[in-house]
Amino acid sequence: MFNIMLVKFVVIFALILASCRVEADNTSVLPEGFVDAAQRSTHTNNWAVLVDASRFWFNYRHVANVLSIYRSVKRLGIPDSQIILMIADDMACNARNPRPGQVYNNANQHINVYGDDVEVDYRGYEVTVENFVRLLTGRTQNGTARSKKLLSDAGSNVLIYLTGHGGDGFLKFQDSEEITSQELADGIQQMWEKKRYNELFFMVDTCQAASLYEKFTSPNVLAVASSLVGEDSLSHHVDPSIGVYMIDRYTYYALEFLEKVQPFSKRTIGEFLQVCPKRVCISTVGVRKDLYPRDPHKVPITDFFGAIRPTRVSTDRINVTLANEDDFIFDKDKMVTKKPFKIVMESQFPSELFK
């Protein structure tokens, strides 16, 4: 009896050792220094909602603000299909603009933030409180184009950036209507209840900006504001050639930080929250992180301003269909392929993906 039990024990112990060895072998296939994105964040995709809520030529800086953030998130990998850009006025084509088709955020004209490939989703009088709230909550009207929908889900990290003229508890849209802090809080709460975000970063550059996040109660929300209640947010500098301010102070220093960030940067949200100290911003930057479960100093900046790049390492054999002489034609000393090559990884993906 004792011998039988001893044999069983040895067999079980051997199986445990074997399973541990297999697990170790599987882990060892990761390249040195490789960090799985899932270890850093639970999100699976990124979205950005960028809003300039004011119009008229003297608010040129607000368009420059939003286009500066647009430039940054697009450069860091978020595609236009996952960026909703709302601009209340078209400064690039304004009759007062001496540089048609161009918008700069600096009097030295270092960066044309309008560029050649800006995709504006809501333009002019389409930028309304109703459309903004419908966008956030997923209640867009029938017939709304896909490019005008926030198609986020429970795995989405969402960046919301707002700029314009505001006051204690409100932000003006088009100088004719307002969205209140309570309406913003309700919209974000609906997003949470409908599983429309995993984590949300709320960023606002306006006067008394911190008042806009005071009503928030939804989980996983991190917020930053360019000024506290009772403070004005100030502009940075004037371009004498066009007679208006170019950009606001907070967004200017935020862009200065983001321009140094690369897609695989180790810079953190915690660092970003400190980009505009009072000595340069004049106003006091407000931060709200009581609803956010992670330490901002351990959250990569690209969790919100970049696009996640899921990577899976496989040890499966890859069959490569090699070319032969019949696959090429020669035309004036140029070699041109007639048939596309196929690389097929067995047992990993359905064959229709390679058709």
Curated annotation (Swiss-Prot):
Instruction: Cite a GO CC annotation.
Output: endoplasmic reticulum
**Pfam families in the record, alphabetically?**
Peptidase_C13
The source's superkingdom equals: Eukaryota
Keyword annotations for this protein?
GPI-anchor biosynthesis, Hydrolase, Protease, Signal, Thiol protease
Per the Swiss-Prot or TrEMBL record, the active site comprises 165, 207
Which pathway does the protein contribute to?
Answer: Glycolipid biosynthesis; glycosylphosphatidylinositol-anchor biosynthesis
- InterPro entries xrefs: GPI_transamidase, Peptidase_C13
A GO MF label: GPI-anchor transamidase activity
Q: What is its EC number?
A: 3.-.-.-
GO biological-process terms attached to the record = attachment of GPI anchor to protein; GPI anchor biosynthetic process; proteolysis
UniProt key word Hydrolase = yes
Identify which top EC class this enzyme belongs to: hydrolase
The positions making up the signal sequence are 1-24
What this protein is reported to do is described as:
Mediates GPI anchoring in the endoplasmic reticulum, by replacing a protein's C-terminal GPI attachment signal peptide with a pre-assembled GPI. During this transamidation reaction, the GPI transamidase forms a carbonyl intermediate with the substrate protein.
Q: Which family does it belong to?
A: Belongs to the peptidase C13 family.
Q: What is this protein called?
A: Putative GPI-anchor transamidase
* Organism expressing this protein natively: Drosophila melanogaster (Fruit fly)
Its gene is PIG-K
